[in-house]
Every structure is written in C-alpha cells, then in structure tokens.
C-alpha cells in the first residue's frame, strides 16, 4: 500500500502490502 504503481502491479502483480489489486491498479 506504499510503493504501489499500476505499471509495476500489472507486471508482477500485486506488491507486498498492497490490497485490492484490480485491473492493473493496486491500493
């Protein structure tokens, strides 16, 4: 929920700490 970016999340998926990952957007 801190270093969450749509681009990074789309590639590796949701990052640690990231919740509610939907449609390429995290947190």
Curated annotation (Swiss-Prot):
Keywords, sorted A to Z: Alpha-amylase inhibitor, Protease inhibitor, Secreted, Serine protease inhibitor
Stated family: Belongs to the protease inhibitor I6 (cereal trypsin/alpha-amylase inhibitor) family.
Tissue expression profile of the protein: Developing endosperm.
Gene Ontology molecular functions: alpha-amylase inhibitor activity; serine-type endopeptidase inhibitor activity
InterPro entries according to UniProt: Allergen/tryp_amyl_inhib_CS (IPR006105)
The name this protein goes by in its record: Alpha-amylase/trypsin inhibitor CM17
GO cellular component: extracellular region
Signal peptide: none
The UniProt record lists the keyword Secreted: yes
Function: Alpha-amylase/trypsin inhibitor. It could be involved in insect defense mechanisms.
Top-rank taxon, per record: Eukaryota
Compartments where located: Secreted
Further comment: CM proteins would be involved in the cooking quality of pasta.
Keyword Secreted: yes
């Amino acid at each position: 929920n801190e270093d969450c970016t749509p681009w990074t999340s789309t590639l590796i998926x949701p990052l640690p700490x990231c919740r509610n990952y939907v449609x390429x957007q995290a947190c």
